[in-house]
Regions:
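N-terminal start-of-chain detector that recognizes signal peptides
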Residues: 33-35, 43-46, 125-129, 163-166, ...
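Loop-centered beta-sheet repeat module
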Residues: 145-191
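Short N-terminal signal/transit or membrane-insertion segments
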Residues: 1-27, 45, 108-134, 188-189
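Bulky hydrophobic/aromatic content
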Residues: 79-165
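Short, basic/aromatic recognition patches that contact phosphate-bearing ligands
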Residues: 1-89, 171
């Protein structure tokens, strides 16, 4: 019995988190239909008790009281306008590849309801920014940040691309050694 109660409460929480927001609340009937569709038995009293248990546990579930109560997730880790700004930044960044941009937008979409996630995906797809193909940039940035934190030197070589898209070392292949102190993001570039 305890296991089925736990599963029901967890599925209720997942449903509220993924499917509801202030513009898309769920009624008790919606919740019961969802739970029954997942093979979890629920009645009105258990939904009321489970939502109250989640609220008592500190989960911000907003209850709109009426003849047919409606429920939705209140505060989330990020508010929708914050997610929109982050999505715009990822989608329009010329340092983040198209593939990585899509992955990051998908991760951001998991932080809100499916309704708002669909809007985020639409906004992200509107970006017409030219994106790089270099997937190594994330690891290079991470390595530099690690070197900064650990107060270690880095070494690198400059290169450029030919019209045939081949990498050619610049400055005779000179190996630069530096002590990095900070990385700064400015004008869509790291410095």
């Amino acid at each position: 019995m305890q296991n089925s109660t736990n599963m029901r409460i967890l599925e209720l929480l997942r449903f509220l988190y993924e499917r509801t927001d202030e513009n898309h609340p769920a009624t008790v009937s919606d919740i019961i239909a969802h739970l029954n569709g997942k093979g979890i038995q629920a009645v009105r009293q258990t939904v009321y008790a489970d939502t109250n248990a989640l609220i008592d546990a500190g989960i911000d579930i907003v209850v709109v009281k009426s003849t047919q109560n409606q429920y939705f997730m209140g505060n989330r880790l990020f508010e929708y306008p914050e997610l929109k700004m982050l999505t715009d930044a990822v989608a329009s960044s010329k340092i983040i590849s198209a593939k990585k941009s899509e992955e990051l937008v998908q991760k951001l979409c998991r932080l809100t309801s499916t309704h708002q996630a669909e809007q985020l995906r639409q906004f992200a797809s509107l970006s017409s920014r030219v994106k790089p193909d270099n997937e190594q940039v994330y690891y290079i940035i991470d390595a530099i940040q690690t070197a900064i934190l650990e107060k270690r030197q880095i070494q690198f070589q400059y290169y450029e691309y030919t019209p045939e898209k081949k990498r050619v070392l610049k400055h005779g292949g000179y190996l630069y050694k530096l002590d990095p102190y900070a990385l700064e993001w400015k004008n869509d570039h790291y410095y």
